[in-house]
Amino acid sequence: MLEKRLLRMGMRLQLLRDRRISSRGPGLHRAKADPQQQKRLTTGLMTQAETQKEAQQRQAAMRKTALWHTGHLQPKTHTHTGMHTQTHRERERNTQRLRDRERRENGRHTHRHTHTLTHTHTHRDTHTASYRRGIETHTTRQPLRLRGSAHDENDPRVREQPRGTQADLSSRSRMAARLLGRLTPTNTVRAGLRLGSRAASPDPAWGFLIVVGPL
């Protein structure tokens, strides 16, 4: 008898353990169902969920179609994903930018815009034009050449000139100094004449300036 009772209690505990039911009662949790029955229920629930999802998708498609026909919704003809939809304020801002750009292209600038563009444009163009004119018109600085120097001898332009011209200039300056010495025979003027004759150069004006200038 005792063995039978122990066997029954063991079977009962095993059954409770399989069903995960506390010895104090079933409690709030549901009993563990049969695996085959659970699989059948899961398949049925999945089928029902798929059916409901398809029905909701069809209803949403019908709503979109109705909105397209009434013009309240524009269809997405592009294939880009993740594009930002412009709001009404952004659309108005972009439209205003396009208007400003067209106004600038047509020449109807505002005062502020005209002042900025005119100043920058004039300033830059003036400097660029003057710089270009300076490059085109101004030649490189020529070195100072003295007659009778080494540079003068190597210069083809000077070599082409006859030496008789230089001799004529020096003789003319000496003749002018002699005439002035006869007109004003003073020691001071004679000293100036000597200095002028010594400093006689290809340009006769140098000796003349030394003679006439105040001593």
From Swiss-Prot:
Extent of Basic residues compositional bias: 109-122
Residue stretches of biased makeup (Polar residues): 163-172
Signal peptide (from-to): none
Skewed-composition ranges (Basic and acidic residues): 87-108, 123-139, 149-162
InterPro entries: FAM27D/FAM27E
Region annotated Disordered, chain positions: 74-172
Family: Belongs to the FAM27 family.
Protein name as it appears in the record: Protein FAM27D1
